């Protein structure tokens, strides 16, 4: 098992990665001070039948353990489920010494984390990710729910007590979820570990290579990229925005196509390609966009739909959290491993997006 130490201004904790990491969950809970009074596990209908009982059995403790299960899918990261989780917590007599365990992918981590951040003004929680995508969202303390007008618009910064990354849980993932999570791995490599980027190009020829020791290697390299950035900027006042590389267009695509119709990672992959496409123009550099495009397509990432309204996408990009005074701010790449947040005029984005759409385009429906 590998341990990755996360240090922020508000909290220090460890990410436990490996085939036996779940066996440490009881010790993690027992070592908490003040002692944990009871435990609420929040999961979804896709994960709970597969892994909920395994986690309950792993918790060799005397305290009451109960679960709250929501439907699966990004659209379930809603105020309705957030409110229902609070109702369940109150009915089961959670208190300020209770613990919430987030068992699932990024959607569950965000929802459960925000419940923990807000219940009685904040209680402890532990992340138990079950997807590759969650290697990003489980670390760093950003928790949120969606609003009909935008993704992750209602939330908080609330660091977990620990992250338990039990890699056998990932083996039940469908292919599209491996691909979705791998996009965030690529993102971390491109913005913060060029050596990892070259390793991925050499060692991960297909998504089937994301298994066993290679998976653990990837997690132990990608997670520290985020950890180092979060250590510098916990509440996204500066460099933490670099982690949004590919997300400005990616989130707009998720919103426009409808949550669940495109995975987060697929949206981010298209967004990263667009960011590289635009970066070449803004910085007058060669970032090997064509080569990068072919590399992404090899893994099955989608092309940019040609029939989506560029005007609508630009409007959605202006609702992005990085936007300021109605101006789009995007994370662009000067060179591999060096990115910056750049203010881009609407017209520039519009022209570039039309050209990118023409280059990449397929029909979305």
Curated annotation (Swiss-Prot):
Keyword Translocase (UniProt): no
Family: Belongs to the sugar phosphate cyclases superfamily. Dehydroquinate synthase family.
InterPro entries registered for this protein in UniProt: Dehydroquinate_synthase, DHQ_synth_AroB, DHQ_synth_fam, DHQS/DOIS_N, DHQS_C
Superkingdom of origin: Bacteria
EC nos: 4.2.3.4
Residues in coiled coil: none
Cofactor note: Binds 1 divalent metal cation per subunit. Can use either Co(2+) or Zn(2+).
Binding site residues for Zn(2+): 184, 247, 264
Cofactor: Co(2+); Zn(2+); NAD(+)
Protein name, per record: 3-dehydroquinate synthase
Keywords noted in UniProt: Amino-acid biosynthesis, Aromatic amino acid biosynthesis, Cobalt, Cytoplasm, Lyase, Metal-binding, NAD, Nucleotide-binding, Zinc
Example GO BP: chorismate biosynthetic process
Species lineage: Bacteria, Bacillati, Bacillota, Bacilli, Bacillales
Known pathway: Metabolic intermediate biosynthesis; chorismate biosynthesis; chorismate from D-erythrose 4-phosphate and phosphoenolpyruvate: step 2/7
CDD domains found in the cross-reference section: DHQS (cd08195)
Annotated SUPFAM superfamilies: Dehydroquinate synthase-like
Cross-referenced NCBIfam families: aroB (TIGR01357)
Reaction(s) catalysed by this chain's protein: 7-phospho-2-dehydro-3-deoxy-D-arabino-heptonate = 3-dehydroquinate + phosphate
Residues reported in the UniProt entry to bind NAD(+): 72-77, 130-131, 142, 151
Role noted for this protein: Catalyzes the conversion of 3-deoxy-D-arabino-heptulosonate 7-phosphate (DAHP) to dehydroquinate (DHQ).
GO cellular component, one term: cytoplasm
Molecular function GO terms recorded: 3-dehydroquinate synthase activity; metal ion binding; nucleotide binding
């Amino acid at each position: 098992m590998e341990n990755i130490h996360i240090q922020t201004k508000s909290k220090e904790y460890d990410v436990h990665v490996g085939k036996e990491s779940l066996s440490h969950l009881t010790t993690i809970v027992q070592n908490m001070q003040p002692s944990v009074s009871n435990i609420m596990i929040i999961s979804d209908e896709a994960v709970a039948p597969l892994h909920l009982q395994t986690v309950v059995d792993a918790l060799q403790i005397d305290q009451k353990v109960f679960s709250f299960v929501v439907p699966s899918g990004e659209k379930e990261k809603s105020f309705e489920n957030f409110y229902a989780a609070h109702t369940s917590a109150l009915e089961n007599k959670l208190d300020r010494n209770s613990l919430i365990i987030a068992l699932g992918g990024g959607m569950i981590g965000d929802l459960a984390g925000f419940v923990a951040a807000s219940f009685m003004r904040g209680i402890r929680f532990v992340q138990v990710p079950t997807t590759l995508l969650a290697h990003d969202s489980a670390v760093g303390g950003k928790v949120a729910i969606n609003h009909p007008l935008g993704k992750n618009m209602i939330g908080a910064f609330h660091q977990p007590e620990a992250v338990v990354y039990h890699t056998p849980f990932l083996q039940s993932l469908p292919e599209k979820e491996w691909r979705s999570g791998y996009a965030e791995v690529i993102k971390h490599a491109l913005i913060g570990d060029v050596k990892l980027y070259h390793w991925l190009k050499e060692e991960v020829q297909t998504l089937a290579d994301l298994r066993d020791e290679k998976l653990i290697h990837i997690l132990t390299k990608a997670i520290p990229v985020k950890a180092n950035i979060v250590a510098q900027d916990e509440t996204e006042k500066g460099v933490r925005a670099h982690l949004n590389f590919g997300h400005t267009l990616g989130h707009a695509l998720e919103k426009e196509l409808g949550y669940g119709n495109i995975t987060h990672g697929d949206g981010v992959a298209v967004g990263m390609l667009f960011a590289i496409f635009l970066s070449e123009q803004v910085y007058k550099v060669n970032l090997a966009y064509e080569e990068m495009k072919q590399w992404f397509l090899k893994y099955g990432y989608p092309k940019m739909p040609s029939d989506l309204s560029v005007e609508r996408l630009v409007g959605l990009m202006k609702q992005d959290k990085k936007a300021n005074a109605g101006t789009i701010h995007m994370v662009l790449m000067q060179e591999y491993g060096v990115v910056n947040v750049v203010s881009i005029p609407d017209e520039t984005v519009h022209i570039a997006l039309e050209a990118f759409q023409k280059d990449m385009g397929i029909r979305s429906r």
